[in-house]
Amino acid sequence: MIQESARETPIFHEADICVLGGSCTGVFAAVRAARLGARVVIVEKQNAFGGVATSGLVNIWHSMKSTDFKRQIIAGLTMETVERLKRIDGVVEQKEKGETPGHFILNTEELKIELDGLIQEAKVKAYLHTMFVAPYVRNGELEAVIVENKSGRGAIKAKMFVDATGDGDLCDRLGLEQRTSSLYQPSTTTAKVDRWDEAIKNHHLGELFLQHKEEFNLPEGFGWGSHIPGTKSVYMYAGTRVYHANSADGEQLTFAEMEGRRQVRGVMDLLRKYADGEKMSLVSLPSYIGTRETRHINCKYQLTNEDVLYGRRFDDAI
């Protein structure tokens, strides 16, 4: 243990609502609150908004309809963003049944710019490259959060805070009751690959993996992905699986990032050797791994299986 010196922390900003985490969820919460008249600030540790969709390269928005495909259950700012992307040919719509949307395939680089626009148009104060460090609690009330960025260490004061960090970082630092799974869902490192379709068009990907995964030390699982709108032959592939890693733990997250990238290389080596991947090339990797599960915060209301399966509506939906 070391003892840090006492210090005074400057206030970077004050608002009605502070949103920690600039995923699409965080952005939509911030924009909606601002449109309703609140003064809002949003804090994101990456260089862009959009979370797993942008920094994680996951370019599919799915489950737009109820399980019987009769009712659209996701709309609002999600669909507004889709319409913005349509204007620049940054999205492809895939209908599953009927005429309501099934899922959307996005160019997530274009999505970054559209989310910037939503934030700016709503006059939300934004901090990118800014890391949440600690809560500031006085007299039992959360008054501010401590953050750090290139300007140094500072505080953001607000009347209300939204934890959109994905891992419940604010709730965890506040010591709120939480639970964890005995077996985490695996994390996935995606990849943008050029000439992917050409590499596998004469092969069955699943059979190749079953036959040769041990040679490249690849885990069991399944792969999926899609072509990137606006490109000629770039494909987003999501088929790696990092098991038994808690991405809310610093050391385990580091392992997961490195192992996920190793698996991407293994997949490409497999296809170069046993398929037609000689001309295939790696275009980009995500700035962080796609995490499916870490902490579960015990909230006032907990979603049930029925809520999800039947698309239950809530009066306070964003």
Placement of each model-derived feature along the sequence:
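Extreme N-terminal leader/targeting segments of oxidoreductases
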Residues: 1-17
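Conserved N-terminal/central alpha/beta ligand/cofactor-binding core
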Residues: 6, 32, 38-39, 44-134, ...
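Core beta-strand elements of the Rossmann-like FAD/NAD(P) dinucleotide-binding domain
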Residues: 13-15, 151-160
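N-terminal Rossmann-like FAD-binding beta1-loop-alpha1 element of flavoenzymes
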Residues: 17-41
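Short hydrophobic core segments
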Residues: 20, 156-166
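Mobile, glycine/GP-rich and aromatic-enriched active-site lid/loop segments adjacent to catalytic centers
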Residues: 90-106, 121, 173, 180-318
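Conserved beta-strand-loop-beta-strand element in the redox core of flavoprotein oxidoreductases
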Residues: 136-155
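Flavin (primarily FAD) binding-site architecture
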Residues: 163-176
